[in-house]
Amino acid sequence: MSHVDVTVDEATINAIRQRMLETGDWERIQKLLRAHLEESGWVDDLKDLAKEKARAQDVPNLENLVKQISESAAGMVSDNVKRDVMLEIESVLDREVDQA
């Protein structure tokens, strides 16, 4: 997997997203991500963290809870999950570039 820093304009990103929606790749990758997050225990870990943070609040505040959880959520995703999903995205992009 090669990582190249490339600045991509918003129009290009929107065009890629639209193409992925049209081909069904967007939904397929979302399902893959959800499955990996479930299998890795991330979903349960996130629920546990949310319960812990909610119990620690003096005054229940959903907005603050969501902010706290959101700050931790991405960092809790395993490297294997990130790698697998990135490989799939790269595969889709490579295929689309080859077809263009």
UniProtKB/Swiss-Prot annotation:
Keywords: Activator, Chromatin regulator, Cytoplasm, mRNA transport, Nucleus, Protein transport, Transcription, Transcription regulation, Translocation, Transport
GO annotation terms (biological process): chromatin organization; poly(A)+ mRNA export from nucleus; protein transport; regulation of transcription by RNA polymerase II; transcription elongation by RNA polymerase II
A GO cellular component entry from the record: DUBm complex
Pfam families: EnY2
Coiled-coil positions: none
GO molecular function: chromatin binding; transcription coactivator activity
Subcellular location: Nucleus, Nucleoplasm; Cytoplasm, P-body
Similarity remark: Belongs to the ENY2 family.
Known role: Involved in mRNA export coupled transcription activation by association with both the TREX-2 and the SAGA complexes. At the promoters, SAGA is required for recruitment of the basal transcription machinery. It influences RNA polymerase II transcriptional activity through different activities such as TBP interaction and promoter selectivity, interaction with transcription activators, and chromatin modification through histone acetylation and deubiquitination.
Assembly information from the UniProt record: Component of the nuclear pore complex (NPC)-associated TREX-2 complex (transcription and export complex 2), composed of at least SUS1, SAC3, THP1, SEM1, and CDC31. TREX-2 contains 2 SUS1 chains. The TREX-2 complex interacts with the nucleoporin NUP1. Component of the 1.8 MDa SAGA transcription coactivator-HAT complex. SAGA is built of 5 distinct domains with specialized functions. Within the SAGA complex, SUS1, SGF11, SGF73 and UBP8 form an additional subcomplex of SAGA called the DUB module (deubiquitination module). Interacts directly with THP1, SAC3, SGF11, and with the RNA polymerase II.
HAMAP family for the chain: ENY2_Sus1
Record protein name field: Transcription and mRNA export factor SUS1
Species per Swiss-Prot/TrEMBL record: Cryptococcus neoformans var. neoformans serotype D (strain JEC21 / ATCC MYA-565) (Filobasidiella neoformans)
Name of the gene: SUS1
